[in-house]
Design a protein with these regions (language model features):
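Solvent-exposed, amphipathic alpha-helical segments
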Residues: 16-27
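Structured beta->alpha junctions
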Residues: 25, 50, 81-83
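Short alpha-helical functional segments enriched in proximate histidine and acidic residues
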Residues: 27, 39, 68
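Short, well-ordered alpha-helical segments enriched in acidic and aromatic residues
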Residues: 30-45
Length: 138
C-alpha cells in the first residue's frame, strides 16, 4: 500500500492521530461545521456507515456537519486509540447528545478507521457505530 508521505515516512503517528481526534471531538462538541470540515483534505472522504456512499470533498463534508450542528445539542465525545500504523489510525469512540427534534437522548459507540496526509488532514474516515436512544416525555 502506498503511503501519503515521502518514501518511508510515517504519516500517521500516535501524536498526529490523537491531535486529529481531539480536534474532531472539539468541533463536534462546539457544533462547528467549519472546524469539522477543516480537518479533512480538500479531496478527503467521510463514510458514516458501510451501507452508504462516502461523502467526497471538504464541501460535502461541511454540508453534512451543518446538518449535524442543527440537530444535535449537548454533545460529549471521547475516544480510545486502539492501533496506529504508518497509514491508518483505529480508535474506539463514543458520543452522547440530545437529538432535536424529537428530543431524544442519544448515545453512540463506534470505531473509526482514519488515514491522514502529511499535513495532518484526514484523507479518509470510515466509521461503524451502534446507537442507543431514549425518548424524552413531553
Amino acid at each position: 500500500m502506498a503511503r501519503s508521505g515521502e518514501a518511508g515516512e510515517r504519516v500517521v503517528t500516535i501524536e498526529s492521530f490523537q491531535s486529529w481526534l481531539d480536534a474532531y471531538g472539539s468541533a463536534w462538541e462546539t457544533r462547528d461545521p467549519q472546524a469539522a470540515a477543516g480537518l479533512f483534505a480538500t479531496d478527503g472522504s467521510y463514510q458514516v456507515s458501510p451501507f452508504v456512499e462516502p461523502m467526497r470533498g471538504r464541501e460535502a463534508i461541511h454540508e453534512y456537519w451543518i446538518q449535524i450542528a442543527r440537530t444535535e445539542q449537548n454533545v460529549k465525545f471521547g475516544y480510545e486509540v486502539l492501533a496506529v500504523t504508518a497509514d491508518f489510525g483505529i480508535a474506539r469512540w463514543w458520543a452522547s447528545f440530545v437529538l432535536i427534534p424529537p428530543w431524544s437522548d442519544t448515545k453512540l459507540d463506534g470505531i473509526f478507521l482514519i488515514s491522514l496526509d502529511a499535513n495532518g488532514n484526514c484523507r479518509s474516515l470510515r466509521e461503524w457505530w451502534h446507537k442507543q436512544q431514549s425518548w424524552r416525555k413531553a
